């Protein structure tokens, strides 16, 4: 929380800052470093879990057990009910998507500025490298574009180019094409846009709220002295702790929502493959599962 007190405004710790720049171009920024750190953690953690099984230790312990429980839940309870037999075709991507967003979200809550700023002297004006990369719209937009490409490639793979193009009619007669095609294209583009905006907005709003609450202490101290700062500080700090707990919940929730909605959109494109299949409706109890023919 120290960077929040030191910030000149509530958004100083949310916006991206250049660490190295040349000729006006930002070469390396806070958010780039935070994304690299999240990726590094994934590279270090998940191969270790794989080696654990390769060594014949089939029973996970400690943090491995926790991470495996999350992975099993995502596969069996989030992805498989939607994608069915095609789950294994997409699970690696969806696992990577979930944990990358989750790690970026959680790293933004950790006070690593104490190490990078006070000890190493890095970051914006030496205040340290910190920030939530997923509060940056361009980061979330990139994740959404990748999801968009995966979704459309799924449609092309299942339907072929002609079938994929035909699905823009939405099952309507050809004479309605001038109306249906623009509507379908708009809907196709709105999906990734909503993914990007939802994640960035939620991660940004929480940090700004936390900065405002903590900022009450500094404003009270400068306005009415140390006594006033102390009196205002007690409820402010308690409120900030509550917000931090809420932020942790939101960090997990937003990673889950992004992954879940991406899975649904993939499932919608994959499900088109079964529309002309005479056995498509044989299992009415599980209409959301994609048949893996």
Where are each of the predicted segments found?
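Selective transmembrane helix interface/packing segments
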Residues: 1-293
């Amino acid at each position: 929380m120290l960077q929040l007190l030191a910030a000149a405004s509530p958004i100083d710790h949310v916006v991206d800052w250049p660490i190295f720049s040349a000729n006006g171009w930002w070469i390396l920024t806070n958010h780039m470093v935070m994304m690299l750190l999240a990726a590094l953690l994934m590279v270090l953690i998940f191969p270790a879990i794989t080696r654990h099984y390769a060594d014949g230790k089939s029973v996970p312990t400690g943090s491995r057990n926790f991470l495996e429980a999350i992975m099993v839940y995502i596969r069996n309870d989030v992805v498989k009910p939607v994608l069915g037999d095609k789950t294994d075709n997409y699970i690696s991507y969806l696992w990577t998507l979930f944990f990358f967003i989750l790690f970026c979200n959680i790293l933004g809550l950790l006070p690593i500025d104490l190490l990078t700023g006070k000890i190493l002297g890095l970051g914006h004006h030496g205040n340290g490298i910190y920030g939530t990369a997923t509060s940056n719209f361009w980061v979330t937009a990139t994740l959404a574009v990748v999801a968009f490409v995966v979704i459309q490639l799924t449609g092309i793979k299942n339907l072929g180019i002609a079938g994929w193009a035909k699905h823009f009619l939405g099952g309507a007669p050809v004479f309605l094409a001038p109306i249906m095609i623009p509507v379908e294209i708009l809907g196709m583009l709105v999906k990734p846009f909503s993914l990007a905006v939802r994640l960035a907005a939620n991660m940004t709003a929480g940090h700004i709220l936390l900065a405002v609450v903590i900022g009450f202490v500094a404003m009270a101290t400068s306005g009415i002295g140390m006594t006033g700062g102390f009196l205002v500080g007690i409820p402010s700090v308690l409120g900030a702790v509550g917000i931090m707990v809420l932020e942790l919940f939101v960090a997990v929730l937003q990673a889950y929502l992004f992954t879940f909605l991406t899975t649904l959109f993939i499932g919608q494109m994959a499900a088109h493959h079964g529309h002309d299949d005479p056995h498509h409706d044989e299992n009415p109890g599980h209409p959301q599962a994609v048949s893996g023919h």
